[in-house]
Design a protein with these regions (language model features):
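Nucleotide/phosphate-binding catalytic cleft detector across ATP-hydrolyzing
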Residues: 1-176, 184-301, 308-364
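Acidic, divalent-metal-coordinating active-site segment for phosphoryl/phosphodiester hydrolysis
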Residues: 179
Length: 364
């Protein structure tokens, strides 16, 4: 009798608890906090922010002057006492305080005024270290997040590219971002084989700048190199040779000069970092179980990330590996779209895909 009375007493409270859970007013926010660009997804609104991961700081007062696109426009043009900072390097936080301010800015813009702090999922490279993971979680919490989840970038990219990662089928994704290249083989909601290398868009830009200095004796900035890469970058023979005029400074005289670069030069210019990326892809393929490799040959490898748009990258990878390759639709946004889809279905995904802080794992 006592047990039945106790159960009758508890039942209304359980119903109230379930009702309150159904009225959870936390907003889901997905963040692709990249080395070069940051994208933010908000539930019910889609992608609400896509800006450079740059912050302008007053070096005297440490005050944040501008964030995102406004800060990027100051690069190379800022007056004395103002420094433009990329708070992330190779996909992880390099300058904590600046990264915190940037996250606060992005979360406020995405959420506005809220009754409860948002549930936030941040994407991180596959090979992130414990201390780097901790820094990202703490920065998100201090920036105003309630519950914090971390998700590996290539897993989010796979989901955002429309791949059903819960299926008992091997799928392979290569996410070529700004700071890292993340390669993963997925099956049944978990990661089977993965590798993350800190060679990606930034290293390609640096390689182009080195090439221009070596071959032409001209100094250019990384932003100029990035523009060259996206305009005429090519890793496979192009039917029409493209060219671009580049303005720089003579390393010998220090005077302004103008040179013309051709798309045919890009493979040589980017050869070293591209070779490193290809080696990493081959390494993952070699470590993939034969059964899953058969699936990958059937379904193909999917490329995501902004640098997958470089002309001929997919053809080059196919030529080297023998695996069919395709570039995802809208590869720039796959990661952040994947975070949104994962937040809506996080209970169905294994911990191989979503990492939670320990104190929050018990609350789910």
């Amino acid at each position: 009798m006592c047990m039945k009375a106790s159960e009758r007493f508890r039942r209304p409270f359980r119903r109230l608890r379930d009702f309150l859970r159904s009225l959870d007013m936390r907003r889901n926010i997905g963040i692709d906090l990249g080395t070069v660009n940051a994208l933010v997804w908000a539930e019910g609104r889609g992608i609400v922010l896509q800006e450079p991961s740059v912050v302008a700081v007053d070096t005297v007062t440490d005050r944040i002057i501008a964030v995102g696109r406004q800060a990027q426009e100051m690069i190379g043009r800022a007056p004395a006492g103002v420094e433009t900072v990329h708070p992330l390097e190779d996909g992880v936080i390099a300058q904590y305080d600046v990264a915190l301010k940037m996250l606060q800015h992005f979360i406020r813009r995405a959420c506005g005024h809220m009754l409860l702090p948002p549930r936030v999922m941040v994407c991180v490279p596959s090979g992130i270290k414990d201390i780097e993971e901790h820094a990202m979680v703490e920065a998100a919490r201090e920036a105003g997040a309630g519950r914090v989840y971390l998700m590996e970038e290539p897993v989010a990219a796979a989901i955002g590219a429309g791949i059903d990662i819960t299926a008992p089928v091997g799928r392979m994704v290569v996410d070529i971002g700004g700071g890292t290249t993340d390669i993963v083989v997925l099956s049944m909601g978990g990661v089977v084989v993965s590798e993350s290398i800190r060679v990606a868009g930034n290293r390609l830009d640096e390689a182009i700048a080195r090439y221009v200095r070596k071959e032409y004796g001209v100094l250019i900035g990384v932003r100029t190199a990035q523009t060259i890469k996206m305009r005429i970058g090519a890793l496979y023979s192009h039917r029409q040779v493209r060219s671009v005029e580049v303005r720089g400074r003579s390393a010998e005289s220090g005077l302004p000069v103008v040179i013309t670069l051709s798309s045919r030069e890009m493979l040589e210019a980017m050869a070293e970092p591209v070779s490193t990326i290809l080696d990493a892809i081959c390494s993952v393929i070699e470590r993939t179980p034969p059964e899953l490799l058969g699936d990958i040959m059937a379904y193909g490898m999917v490329l995501t990330g902004g640098n997958s748009l470089i002309y001929g990258f997919d053809h080059l990878i196919h030529k080297v590996t023998g695996v069919p390759v395709r570039v995802a639709e809208d590869p720039l946004t796959c990661v952040v779209k994947g975070t949104g889809m994962a937040l809506r279905n996080y209970r169905q995904l294994s911990e191989g895909a979503i990492h939670l802080t320990k104190e929050r794992r018990d609350r789910l």
